[in-house]
Amino acid sequence: MSSKKAKTKTKKRPQRATSNVFAMFDQSQIQEFKEAFNMIDQNRDGFIDKEDLHDMLASLGKNPTDAYLEAMMNEAPGPINFTMFLTMFGEKLNGTDPEDVIRNAFACFDEEATGTIQEDYLRELLTTMGDRFTDEEVDELYREAPIDKKGNFNYIEFTRILKHGAKDKDD
């Protein structure tokens, strides 16, 4: 007696993201996203794939190219299940950049590539360049920021907190 399992799905399981994406939206918004997801998931397999996108766009009178569909699919780091769908929309709607973009922006001012920036230097940058912060805004930022006893702002940890929330004290 052979115990071969029938292969019903060839999709690999999406990587689990430690994300508080469900906390970003209220219950009615999540329900609306679920309805939108189900409308796009034409074959009802719980994932949005290239064919689902094609069928959905075709139903809207569009004729997307394969390259266009491929570019859309490549915005996700893996298969698009509902959590991934919500995460992608959450980032777009929240207006926050992806984690690596934020980290790289800080890294421009980290000449020694230590993952930290001296807090006084960062304050100067934030209050004199670009969309200038007030001193009060910098103080507010520093209140919960990962700054060591030497006054080094850990932008790698800060970026992680910004995108995923603070670690629990037990971690």
UniProtKB/Swiss-Prot annotation:
Kindly provide the name given to this protein in its UniProt entry.
Answer: Myosin regulatory light chain 12B
Additional record remark: This chain binds calcium.
Which gene codes for it?
A: MYL12B
Q: Which Gene3D superfamilies match?
A: EF-hand
The source's superkingdom equals Eukaryota
User: What kind of modification does the protein receive after translation?
Assistant: Phosphorylation increases the actin-activated myosin ATPase activity and thereby regulates the contractile activity. It is required to generate the driving force in the migration of the cells but not necessary for localization of myosin-2 at the leading edge. Phosphorylation is reduced following epigallocatechin-3-O-gallate treatment.
Keywords (A to Z) from UniProt = Calcium, Metal-binding, Motor protein, Muscle protein, Myosin, Phosphoprotein, Repeat
Phosphoserine: residues bearing it: 19
Instruction: Please give one Pfam family short name.
Output: EF-hand_11
GO annotation, biological process: regulation of cell shape
Q: Which residues bind Ca(2+)?
A: 41, 43, 45, 52
Q: Which GO terms describe its molecular function?
A: calcium ion binding; myosin heavy chain binding
Q: Where is the signal peptide?
A: none
Coiled coil (residue ranges):
none
